[in-house]
Amino acid sequence: MQQTFFKDPILGEIIFDENTKWMYELVNTKAFQRLRNIKQLGINFHFYPSGVHTRYAHSLGVYELIRRILNSSAFLNIDQIKKQTVLVAGLLHDLGHGPHSHAFEIYFAKNPDFKKQLFIHEKVTSMLVNSEPIVSILKANKIDPNLIGALIDENQNIQPINWWMRQLISSDLDTDRMDYLLRDAYFTGTSHSLVDYQSIINGMECVDNQGTYEIVFQEKCLPFIENFLITRHHMYQSIYSDGRSIATELNLWFVFQRIKALIEEDNFNFHNFKNVESVIKPLLKNQLFKKSLLTCFVKLDDYVFHSFLVNTFETTKDAILKTLLDSYLNTLKFQVKFYESCEKRDLDFELKVKEYQTPSYFITKFNNQFKGFYEGWNKHKNELKIKTSQNKIKNLSEISMLVKRSNELFFENSFYRWANVFYQN
């Protein structure tokens, strides 16, 4: 097989070379091809019309960033199988996303803060990795599918995962975040995401720390790392936690709360959407997603899901469900109001809830949890490490006053934005 490459507006070229050409088999599986029809930003494209890029392109981008990192001189001493394991984990890390990406996990949670999720995309990804044909492709190339699953789903605690492997897949400065910040900013037209990923890669070192390898960053990388963290913070403020996106996601949460009630009354018809029914009906009955549903799941994407919602809107005779779907499919009628405190929010909620005949479908409290500016501070051993000019390894929060002060400011002002989400005609 000749070298295969994709042209990419973010990274220039994505290459499957002599060492990774077998991974192109994974790209051609149905589970991976499905990602062509899963939008990276979920339902945010409603408000960012050009933000229709896909999990497919993002997954290829993560793979390419890892490939470039592992081809650098810093990783010459790393075992080839370990390198390929991390590459595969990066390539496959998003296989388990449902339609609308992260929002799908909210729709079937018991409450809108989704503290208890019935569908967790990392676990579904691990199931797909351990299913045919992917599992056979991995084993034929001496890659342990369980290790891939453990790299993607952090709750699977198996050995031997070196810390450097986890750092590239899931950390405060991982390849997933590098790619999605660049890609999301480009396709939404957001100008404040100027991540200098090449300078960050150039400043990486893989060092032996008491028998296990870990990634450290040269001190000259500090401005680029700080900029990366600032960029992510701003992207959450301006795009990922946009109030309109929250309102739209909660609109659909209400839709599925109503569908759930109609199913319990034996008064809902999925019509010909049997794969949708097979996947979401157990979730609406508060059952965890099971591996036996994977065959149906890989047939679900944004387009199938949208067709199901449109068909339901056109055929339902239930006035509440029709009103909720009209808001989602046509003109969004749900709004988000943020408050300075939980007490003020609750007081306003008690007044506003009286305006609705069936309030459980039209108004809810919502605690919007902020993403920390830098999360390494609360898991001290997992902090980003900086190699100083004196060759000492220190935690990022010791070196960067920006990181230290930003976290202090962040936690002084609380983890949450208290909100009410409600229908306003």
Swiss-Prot record:
Pfam family, one: HD
Gene3D superfamilies: Hypothetical protein af1432
Any one Gene Ontology molecular-function term assigned to this protein's record: dGTPase activity
Family annotation (InterPro entries): dGTPase-like, HD/PDEase_dom, HD_domain
Disruption of the gene: reported phenotype: Probably essential, it was not disrupted in a global transposon mutagenesis study.
Annotated signal peptide: none
Domain called HD: residue spans: 55-181
CDD domains per the UniProt record, alphabetical: HDc (cd00077)
Regions annotated as coiled coil: none
Domain of life: Bacteria
Gene Ontology terms: biological process: dGTP catabolic process
Protein name: Uncharacterized protein MG461
Disulfide bond sites: none
SUPFAM superfamilies, per the entry: HD-domain/PDEase-like (SSF109604)
